Structure formats: C-alpha cells, structure tokens
Amino acid sequence: YPGIVYFVHGTLFGKLGKKLLLEIVVLVFLTVLYLMDYERVQKTADQVFVTRCGKSTLHLKMIGGILGGLIYSALLLLASYGWFLAKLPLKGLWKVPVSASMMAEPRFGMLNPFVTFWNVNLRSYLLLTLVMFLAIALLAGILAGAGWYCLKNSYLVFLVLSVLLMGLVQAALVHTTTFLDIVLSICNPGVLWITCGAWFMENDLTLSFAGSEFCSLFGCGILILLPYFIGKKRFRKWELM
C-alpha cells in the first residue's frame, strides 16, 4: 500500500486517530461526571455528603468512572481499528519501518516520509499510539474529577471543559518564536491533538526532540493534579447548606 496512493499512515493515525481521541475524551468526561454528579441529580447529596465517610465515596466514584471510561475507550479503539484493519489488512507490513519510503505521503506540497526519532515499525507505532490514547483518557478523567470538585455541577463542568479544550487547541496554533513556545507546547494538551498522527517524530522547532509527547503528558498531568488536590481539599471542608 504505497502512501502516495492509499495514505495508510495519515488515515490510520491522523484522520481516524484525531476523531477517536476526541470521542475518547468526551466519553471519559461523561462517564466520570455521571457518577460523581449522581447524588446531586438524585437529590440525595444532603444525606451522603453530610459525613466524612460519605464524602470519601466521591473519590471512589471518580476512580470507577475513570476505569469505566478506559474500558469504553479500549472497546471503541478495538472496534474502530479492527474495522479499519478488516477492510485494509496489513498482513506482511507490520514489521515495515514507519520511516520507509513506501509509507511516505504528500505533505506540505512534497512527498515527505514519516521519520521517527526511534526505529519503530508499523506495529510498534500502533501500540505506542494506543498507549498515548489511554494515557490521555486517564488525564481527561482526572480533569473531569477536578472540575466537579471545584464546581460541583456536571453540566457546568462539561461546558467549562469543552470551552477550555477548544481554547487550548486554538492557543496551540499561536507561536511567539521564543522559548515560551516550548513551554506552552509541553503544557498544552491541544498540541497532542493537533499533532496526532505525527507523534514520536519531528513536527516543528518547538517539538524537535525525542519524547516530547511524554513530556507533554507529564506537564499536563502536573497542571491537572494541582486543581484536583485543591478542589478535593476544599470539598472535604464543604458544608451543605
């Protein structure tokens, strides 16, 4: 399947990958927020959250929501990529390097190969991409939990997070041509969505080092954990009116 004709890499990891990543994040948001907001919706919050033990159950619900979201995400990935590979079998190509000239696709007006920082074949690249998807799903679940701890309303949290993520994607397109670009790229999850399909390879000057995706996961994780712990601490001291 020459890339110039079939666009296997761009379709499998780019077009399809971006859609799946967006669906996974929304799915995890809904799963976590549904469980955490159950008491408020059912009007039993004054009975459950009145004690310290009752408040601690919310943390377990968040964990359950994240685990459920990860399972749903895995099933979504299995069904989507399974359907793709059933229609376009890659038997005999799994050990072909991603940077092979056969995989090259027309990009930026030229026929450019996908030169990765490490020598990975198609199978390894797919596995690394799936790991990235699940890691992002985990961070999305923690972010949803942090949002509920701070706002205590699933509808409001979903609205705020949707606007926030759309803003981060737009902010990722802004460049200052300074060192600040590197910091913003590492701490902005919107960059991971924009560069989906070109992970583990050089994209631009701000992402021209190996492991930039893992640095982005770490940086975003730190920024997400801060409001999570602050919101959780405030929730423990929260008194029902």
State each model region's role.
Residues 44, 57-59:
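Alpha-helical transmembrane segments and their immediate interhelical loop/hinge regions
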Residues 154-168, 185-187:
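Central hydrophobic cores of alpha-helical transmembrane segments
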Residues 158, 216-217:
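Transmembrane alpha-helices of multi-pass eukaryotic membrane proteins
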Residues 143-151, 219-241:
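Junction motif at the cytosolic side of a transmembrane helix
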